[in-house]
Amino acid sequence: MESNFIDWHPADIIAGLRKKGTSMAAESRRNGLSSSTLANALSRPWPKGEMIIAKALGTDPWVIWPSRYHDPQTHEFIDRTQLMRSYTKPKK
């Protein structure tokens, strides 16, 4: 059965960040990560990275990646924020 939930294309995510005046690398560094780390969220599920990207775009992660937040058996959305490890921003 095919899912009706279509994720944003990675190029659309990158373009959205550019329109907001930022980039994947800049958001990675802003959140205390290596400059290329955040790009992992484009190709595989990573709740923390998805949240960082969504916040930078001014939306929610389930809007960008509905397939990652939808349970096909119960047809409900999953709260994946519970899967995130706690994270404290480094002091500058």
Swiss-Prot record:
Q: What does this protein do?
A: This protein is involved in positive regulation of the metabolism of sugars.
Q: Which Pfam families match?
A: HTH_35
- Tell me which residues form the DNA-binding region: 50-69
Q: Which UniProt keywords apply?
A: Activator, DNA-binding, Transcription, Transcription regulation
What protein family does this chain belong to?
A: Belongs to the ner transcriptional regulatory family.
**Which protein is depicted?**
Sugar fermentation stimulation protein B
**What domain of life?**
Bacteria
InterPro entries registered for this protein in UniProt: Lambda_DNA-bd_dom_sf, Ner_HTH_dom
**Which gene is the coding source of this polypeptide chain?**
sfsB
Asked whether the keyword Transcription regulation is assigned, the reply is yes
Annotated GO molecular function terms are: DNA binding
